[in-house]
Amino acid sequence: MMKTTIMFMLVVVISLTYSSEEQEVARTYCGAHLANTLADLCFGVEKRSGAQYAPYFWTRQYLGSRGKRGVVDECCFRPCTLDVLLSYCG
């Protein structure tokens, strides 16, 4: 009985630790902290060529509200994840 309880507790602790490592925390990034984080994340990310950009009329039609906001709106005025910051690279 005691071994089963210990084993169960061990499994619970390991699963909680593993799941918390996978969750990405949303944070606010402003000013120099935002600039430095973007520089670190985007270092080595290749810039997109002009051919990879969609035509202007297509982007305006399908970007929706995100096309009107910038990285400061998304990551300084409210928390964002590193994945959102990475979307601004290139």
UniProtKB/Swiss-Prot annotation:
Classification via InterPro entries: Bombyxin (IPR017097), Bombyxin_B (IPR027285), Insulin-like (IPR016179), Insulin-like_sf (IPR036438), Insulin_CS (IPR022353), Insulin_family (IPR022352)
CC terms in the record's Gene Ontology section: extracellular space
Disulfide bonds: 30-76, 42-89, 75-80
Keywords associated with the record: Cleavage on pair of basic residues, Disulfide bond, Hormone, Secreted, Signal
Chief place where the protein resides: secreted
One MF term in the entry's GO annotations: growth factor activity
Protein's UniProt keywords contain Cytoplasm: no
Pfam families per the UniProt record, alphabetical: Insulin
Compartment(s) where it occurs, according to its Swiss-Prot or TrEMBL record: Secreted
Propeptide span(s): 49-67
Record's signal peptide: 1-20
Family designation: Belongs to the insulin family.
Assembly with partners or alone: Heterodimer of a B chain and an A chain linked by two disulfide bonds.
Note: Silk worm has two kinds of PTTH: 4K-PTTH and 22K-PTTH; there are many forms of 4K-PTTH.
Protein task: Brain peptide responsible for activation of prothoracic glands to produce ecdysone in insects.
Protein name, as recorded: Bombyxin B-3
Organism: Bombyx mori
